[in-house]
A protein has these predicted regions:
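Short internal beta-strands
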Residues: 28-37
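Short hydrophobic/aromatic-enriched beta-strand-loop microsegments
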Residues: 30, 47-57, 126-128
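Short, acidic/small-residue loops that bind anionic groups at enzyme active sites
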Residues: 32, 94-114
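Short, acidic/turn-prone active-site loops that include or flank metal/cofactor-
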Residues: 53-60, 81, 110
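Mid-chain, well-packed structural core segment of small domains
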Residues: 60-99
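Short, glycine-/small-residue-rich phosphate/pyrophosphate-handling segment
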Residues: 109-133
């Protein structure tokens, strides 16, 4: 599965801690992330992560394009509630995930449910509906 990681500044440390906790599960999948989030997670976990531009420089749009091309299977975007309303990136990523039926977590509680589902194989339907070449 292809997993995208994104986090607002005040949630980056939470994303790092989440990825440390679930490194064993994440290691079996391909991960991409916006630049700073991905660098922090890679440094803390040793996981190989494809880095896109920072969100402010267009990284959100790069991940959004991969969602639109059905190249992302799961999105973890830890949102700061104080930034949520003004964040066009959150709204666009959430809209694309809804449009293309991509599981999306905007907080750690939902991310834990999705990551456990990933571990159990609950998301394997993505491989059937959208087979990778």
């Amino acid at each position: 599965m292809n997993i995208a990681l994104m986090a607002h500044d005040r949630k980056k440390e939470l994303m790092v801690q989440f990825c440390i906790a679930y490194c064993g599960i994440l290691s079996g999948h391909s991960i991409c992330a916006t630049k700073t989030t991905g660098r922090l997670v890679a440094e803390a976990t040793g996981l190989p992560i494809t880095l896109y531009l920072s969100a402010a420089q267009g990284g959100s749009q790069q991940i959004g394009a991969r969602i639109a091309y059905n190249e992302i299977d799961l999105v973890l975007f830890f949102c700061d509630p104080a930034e949520y309303e003004s964040s066009a990136a959150v709204h666009e990523i959430a809209r694309l995930c809804d449009q293309y039926s991509i599981p999306f977590a905007s907080n750690v509680a939902t991310a834990e449910v999705l990551i456990q589902g990933l571990r159990r194989g609950d998301l394997d339907w993505r491989n059937i509906v959208n087979p990778k070449k």
